[in-house]
Amino acid sequence: MDRNSVTGLALIALIMIVWLQFMSPDKKPVIRESAKKAASVEQVNVPLKPAPVSASDAFGAFASAANGKARKMVVENDLFRATISSKGATLTSLVLKKHLDGALQPVQLVSNRADGALSLLFLTREGRKIDTRDLYFTGGSVDTLHTVTGKESYSVRYRLNVSKNRNILITYSFTGDSYRVGYDVQLNGFSSALAGNEYQLQWDGGLGYTEKNREDEAHNALAGAYLGGSLVKLDAAKDNQAYREEQSGEAKWVAVRNKYFVAALIPAGPTGGFYLDGSKKAGNEFENYLASLKMEVPVSGASLDNSFSLYMGPLDYDIVRAQKAELEKIMDFGWDWLTRPFAEYIILPVFSWMNKFIHNYGLIIIIFAFLIKLVTYPLSLASTKSMKKMAALQPMLKELQDKYKDNPAKLQSELGRIYKEAGVNPLGGCLPVVLQMPLLFAMFYVFRSSIELRQHGFLWAHDLSVPDSILNLGFTIPMYGDHIALMPILMAGTVFVQQKITPTAQTNDQMKIMLYMFPAMMLLFFNNMPSGLGLYYLMFNVFSVAQQFYINSTTTEADMPNVSIAAPARQKKKKSGGGK
């Protein structure tokens, strides 16, 4: 490995330092922060008057529905158990049956930060802010539990009577084998009753946290919307600050998410835009989010029907993409132009295909590392031969550097000639590493945020989506963390071995530094990374070491360059002449 190769590796290491520090959970960036407050939605989301003293003052025409008794019913399908309350016709609980939280209890998606997750929000002509969670609906089911399975379907309807000709109907539709729930809203007699001629359908309270590492989960929690082909994210990154984002137009969906789960509102028709809100209290990792769709109410017409779908479930790429609403855009796979294509079109499809036959993700990662090593073998072979040639050329290059130390232009010219005659590229040794960087970064995003690896163990690693900690230190070492993970130690050892057996130039101070510095940096980088990523890089290096032994044993003297330090003499042209 020559000076240029060392420089290239150092630059790659610098890129990793900057990138990994940027991605560190404890330095969480604000994804999108806006304090703009458009008047149309500001009226809906901010109280307009002091707290009233009576139901009539507070709710006006809705006062008759402000008192009642909440009745709850449970709808259970193959995937979740949903609880609906007649107060607000809202979801008060949604428990996923196939996923466990950090305490090994079924995941609860509805947080306790709000009195129910779903509601309609609107402003009356008299200036009263109405949230349907404050009102009591009739209807529902006389049964307290209804079970639906397979392809079976079940619907339940709630009704809110305001006056003789004015009412609200809300209908939930469940399917036995789906995370998707139909949600239909019918407004009768409201064409001239609402200020701004709009209402909002909102999910309030964010999502309940499910992981042991609350700080890491907060790093991934956010509210989002998809409008005009662009993803808008709102992240309540700082304590005691108001975060708001509002846009007009046709939103395809709004959603709130934590690290591995999402709740999304997907309209069947056009919308008037969206509104996102977020906050975080000091001393508490939980980030509270609200996401709402703005729906227009025509000034004419006796009734309005709007249909929506609710997706409440895991951030499983195949399931989320099957919603056909581009909801997969809320999954963070890094840069759209670089790492996301690797994640969506290589890593996830290959993992999904292999999982049909192999149900151990540790083995899948090992096989995937072998396949990548196999695909990159031609590059590795060319790189190794290039480095071996560079090593053979080092005495000649040193002689040239001494000979032309006072003539840089001549030195560069001679170096170029030597490289050309030998058929080597000074940076050829870095090429395989550079080409694998996008894949490595994409795997970081996949392993960090995809639910496929969550709570799947391998050997001593109990969960491939988190570090494989074998010892908690009780204190934090800067850039390293508060624990010792075994996978990064083994991986750093393979990096050291690989460098030792890789052809290099004559031993110099640069190479001695890189021999120890690069494994040390990798140890620091990977200690807080998902153990699945460490397993991939560990096995990739093991295969690289085996490959290097093979290449070293099959390279012959015939592969070495045969060049001279002296430039080839130019042949003199013969003079044309007559006879002898």
Curated annotation (Swiss-Prot):
It comes from the Bacteria. It is a multi-pass membrane protein. Keywords: Cell inner membrane, Cell membrane, Chaperone, Membrane, Protein transport, Transmembrane, Transmembrane helix, Transport. One of its GO terms (cellular component) is plasma membrane. The chain crosses the membrane at residues 5-25, 259-279, 362-382, 427-447, 477-497, 513-533. Its main location: membrane. One of its GO terms (biological process) is protein transport. CDD domains: 5TM_YidC_Alb3, EcYidC-like_peri. It is found in: Cell inner membrane. GO terms for molecular function: membrane insertase activity. Pfam families: 60KD_IMP (PF02096), YidC_periplas (PF14849). Interacts with the Sec translocase complex via SecD. Specifically interacts with transmembrane segments of nascent integral membrane proteins during membrane integration. Belongs to the OXA1/ALB3/YidC family. Type 1 subfamily. Required for the insertion and/or proper folding and/or complex formation of integral membrane proteins into the membrane. Involved in integration of membrane proteins that insert both dependently and independently of the Sec translocase complex, as well as at least some lipoproteins. Aids folding of multispanning membrane proteins. This is Membrane protein insertase YidC. It comes from Chlorobium phaeovibrioides (strain DSM 265 / 1930).
